[in-house]
Amino acid sequence: MPELPEVETSRRGIEPYLVGHSIQYAVVRNARLRWPVSEQILTLSDQPVLSVQRRAKYLLIELERGWIIVHLGMSGSLRMLREENEDEAGKHDHVDLVINNGMILRYTDPRRFGAWLWCEDLATSSVLAHLGPEPLSEAFNGDYLYEKSRNKRTLIKPWLMDNKLVVGVGNIYASESLFSAGILPDRPAGSLTKAEAALLAKTIKAVLQRSIEQGGTTLRDFLQSDGKPGYFAQELQVYGRAGEPCRTCGTPIESAKHGQRSTFFCRRCQR
């Protein structure tokens, strides 16, 4: 599943081709995604793009009369291609935005768990309501994590993945951040000390920022907007490495199920 770095990589990749230009029209080949593609998107015509933003794992395309909200789901990706390639769409290419600069923004999603929604005012969007702070913002810090963790019996790993606590820390980056901070994922969140909370917040920021710089993590379906894979997978310390030696101490990496999601950790390096 594309996580925050992959979505931010997509945002940065498509922004130069959209902002300052207009969407001439949309081509929707399959409207049956996680939710049906909004009717307002189907009827877009000559709409200037004012900005391309991100909130959590949602891409927000600002137009003069509203917003397109895009979620990549489990396997979605966005890429830019030239308009002459419009007829080369495959069976998993569900949505195109045709831009007035000769480019097309194409949405590909083999599993069709993504979403293309319309909203006139982001403040009224149900999918954006009740989200926690952005992990790369100043609002997310050690003091915040420590206060939120008090008396929490939830295991640290699934706790970090709760979008009401902090957005965008998905399965990959929760495992990687906990390893970098030396914290076992199966401890209760309430066991965090102030020092550990400060280190964990700092580590989450560093891991996410590094992944963004590397273009995200390509595990199955994710590609950058230029069609190239992300390279952070080459730097993964624990995720997906069960049974392999820890890159730090050589102890075999272990895996466990937390909240029905696979968690990876080093029993020696993490406490």
UniProtKB/Swiss-Prot annotation:
InterPro entries: DNA_glyclase/AP_lyase_DNA-bd, DNA_glyclase_Znf_dom_DNA_BS, Formamido-pyr_DNA_Glyclase, FPG_cat, MutM-like_N-ter, Ribosomal_uS13-like_H2TH, Znf_DNA_glyclase/AP_lyase, Znf_FPG/IleRS. A zinc finger (FPG-type) spans 237-271. Its EC number is 3.2.2.23, 4.2.99.18. The keyword Hydrolase applies. It catalyses: Hydrolysis of DNA containing ring-opened 7-methylguanine residues, releasing 2,6-diamino-4-hydroxy-5-(N-methyl)formamidopyrimidine; 2'-deoxyribonucleotide-(2'-deoxyribose 5'-phosphate)-2'-deoxyribonucleotide-DNA = a 3'-end 2'-deoxyribonucleotide-(2,3-dehydro-2,3-deoxyribose 5'-phosphate)-DNA + a 5'-end 5'-phospho-2'-deoxyribonucleoside-DNA + H(+). GO terms for molecular function: 8-oxo-7,8-dihydroguanine DNA N-glycosylase activity; class I DNA-(apurinic or apyrimidinic site) endonuclease activity; damaged DNA binding; zinc ion binding. PROSITE patterns: FPG_CAT, ZF_FPG_1, ZF_FPG_2. The active site is at P2, E3, K57, R261. SUPFAM superfamilies: Glucocorticoid receptor-like (DNA-binding domain), N-terminal domain of MutM-like DNA repair proteins, S13-like H2TH domain. One of its GO terms (biological process) is base-excision repair. The keyword Zinc applies. CDD domains: EcFpg-like_N (cd08966). Keywords: DNA damage, DNA repair, DNA-binding, Glycosidase, Hydrolase, Lyase, Metal-binding, Multifunctional enzyme, Zinc, Zinc-finger. Pfam families: Fapy_DNA_glyco, H2TH, zf-FPG_IleRS. Binds 1 zinc ion per subunit. Gene3D superfamilies: 1.10.8.50, MutM-like, N-terminal (3.20.190.10). HAMAP family: Fapy_DNA_glycosyl. Involved in base excision repair of DNA damaged by oxidation or by mutagenic agents. Acts as a DNA glycosylase that recognizes and removes damaged bases. Has a preference for oxidized purines, such as 7,8-dihydro-8-oxoguanine (8-oxoG). Has AP (apurinic/apyrimidinic) lyase activity and introduces nicks in the DNA strand. Cleaves the DNA backbone by beta-delta elimination to generate a single-strand break at the site of the removed base with both 3'- and 5'-phosphates. This is Formamidopyrimidine-DNA glycosylase.
